[in-house]
Amino acid sequence: MVPGTGGGRDCLTLVVATALTQLLWLPGCCGSHIVGGHEVKPHARPYMASVNFEGHHHCGGFLFHAHWVLSAAHCFSDRDPSTGLVVLGAHALLTPEPTQQVFGIAAVVSHPDFEPTTQANDICLLRLNGSAVLGPAVRLLRLPRRGAKPPVAGTRCRVSGWGSVSDFEEPPPGLMEVEVRILDLSVCNSSWQGQLSPAMLCTHSGDRRRRGFCSADSGGPLVCGNRAHGLVSFSGLWCGDPKTPDVYTQVSAFVSWIWDVVRASPTPGSMGCSLRAV
């Protein structure tokens, strides 16, 4: 705006816009992306799952059992699971691939103590309406062992996703990934003004560069030592900003609950999968 023009109306607009930019991105919102990462080799992360609504990628997740995907509970806060699909074996979501397996969602089991306002216990299980066919492009990712402690500060981990690769919602060419480091939870909690719970994990870039995730990558795994130690939960306004470190659900805190849910649930039939043709 040119100085001296527009009057009070433009001034008010500027004030409102400035105030809005101070808000956090809500998890699952648009315009989010892996920051400072790179495209992985096709199917190098065969455990990755895309949760899809109305033909569009909505959240991530990962396959830990032939019938089950782990994701973030907030991804389903305002969604009807019966209208969603889970895509396995994908690299480029916008391109038909013979490796892709597509399932309906038979059930969503969110943690009973999930708190949407604080994102505490932000974890859910998706029961597929069929059994994944395991192979080179579709494989399981291991959970932490029961009673395992979270990775120590400084541990190098990786996080993957299909979120957009620019602030203009540009879709990625394929699955993106970035390397991050575990940040001490007490240090992270100070940055978040004491809002975090003990069952969370934080990461940062380890240097001054912006690296990390944004909310369209929600539900995707934080992989440390070939096990899923975190689930993407929330971040600040500026993705990868060290002032507001990326926050994950700490998977090791929920391993017993996860397997209790799996054991208590019926096994679906094996005919729910459709293989995408070229």
Swiss-Prot record:
Instruction: Please report a single Pfam family linked to this protein.
Output: Trypsin
CDD domains hit by this protein: Tryp_SPc
- Kindly give the PROSITE patterns that the UniProt entry links to this protein: TRYPSIN_DOM, TRYPSIN_HIS
Subcellular location as annotated: Cytoplasmic granule lumen; Secreted
InterPro entries per the UniProt record, alphabetical: Peptidase_S1_PA, Peptidase_S1_PA_chymotrypsin, Peptidase_S1A, Trypsin_dom, TRYPSIN_HIS
UniProt key word rRNA-binding: no
**Peptidase S1 domain sequence ranges:** 34-263
Which Gene Ontology cellular component terms are annotated? azurophil granule lumen; extracellular space
Any one GO biological process: protein maturation
Signal peptide range? 1-31
Task: Give the chief site where it resides.
Answer: cytoplasm
Keywords from the named record: Disulfide bond, Glycoprotein, Heparin-binding, Hydrolase, Protease, Secreted, Serine protease, Signal
Tell me the SMART domains matching this sequence.
Answer: Tryp_SPc (SM00020)
EC code: 3.4.21.-
Provide the disulphide bond pattern: C59-C75, C157-C224, C188-C202, C214-C239
- Which residues are named in the active-site annotation? H74 (charge relay system), D122 (charge relay system), S218 (charge relay system)
Residues modified by glycosylation = N129
Enzyme class, one word?
A: hydrolase
Post-translation: what modifications?
A: After cleavage of the signal peptide, the N-terminus is probably further processed by CTSC. Processing by CTSC is probably required for accumulation in cytoplasmic granules; in the absence of CTSC the protein does not accumulate.
User: What is this protein's function per UniProt?
Assistant: Serine protease that cleaves preferentially after Arg residues. Can also cleave after citrulline (deimidated arginine) and methylarginine residues.
Q: Which PANTHER family match?
A: KALLIKREIN-RELATED (PTHR24271), SERINE PROTEASE 57 (PTHR24271:SF55)
Protein name according to UniProt? Serine protease 57
